[in-house]
């Protein structure tokens, strides 16, 4: 029963009902209908917040890209998204555009939110990616959620040192050492 409430909640959240939660539903059981049978009914609880019963659309999207070392920032538009990036920009706009599943004006879906965050993380060039949602006040549109994406670039080089004990085919055991260096953003464009 809990899984069904979660499934319904997820369906609603993917149809714009961003604030809907499984806890807003309850089961009513009737055992008087027939012997050894239970009639279940799924209802909304009486005190569900009004914001949970309203579908939301995506409002303004702002992407803030920061480097480890602070520098001057550029602001530009990419499709309908405002991007604020510190120079030098370490990702190509085309690649950044492909990672954004949310678009202004569309119904807000949690799947698109998760997909955007996952794809940005999988690029492997960011130390952290945070996606925040801000509801607008009633003057600009009470059914709109602004999206802010904050991503901080990671160090371009990573080094790892591994030590181990190895055994050869002649039954001799000896020390082993491995030093690895990897460049997370070799061409400085965010390529995978």
For each predicted feature, which ranges?
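Short sequence motifs at beta-strands and strand-loop junctions characteristic
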Residues: 171-173
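Residues immediately flanking
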Residues: 183
């Amino acid at each position: 029963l809990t899984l069904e409430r979660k499934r319904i909640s997820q369906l609603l959240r993917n149809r714009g009902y961003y604030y809907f939660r499984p806890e807003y539903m309850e089961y009513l059981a009737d055992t008087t209908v027939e012997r050894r049978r239970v009639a279940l009914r799924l209802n909304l609880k009486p005190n569900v917040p009004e914001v949970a019963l309203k579908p939301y659309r995506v409002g303004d999207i702002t992407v803030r890209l920061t480097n480890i070392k602070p520098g001057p920032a550029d602001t530009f538009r990419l499709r309908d998204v405002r991007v604020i990036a510190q120079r030098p920009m370490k990702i190509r706009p085309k690649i950044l555009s492909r990672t954004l599943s949310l678009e202004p004006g569309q119904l807000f879906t949690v799947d698109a939110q998760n997909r955007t965050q996952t794809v940005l993380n999988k690029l492997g060039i960011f130390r952290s990616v945070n996606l925040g949602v801000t509801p607008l006040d009633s003057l600009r549109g009470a059914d709109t959620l602004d999206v802010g994406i904050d991503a901080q670039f990671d160090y371009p080089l990573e080094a790892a040192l591994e030590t181990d004990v190895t055994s050869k085919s002649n039954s001799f055991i000896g020390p082993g050492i491995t030093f690895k260096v990897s460049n997370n953003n070799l061409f400085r464009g965010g390529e995978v």
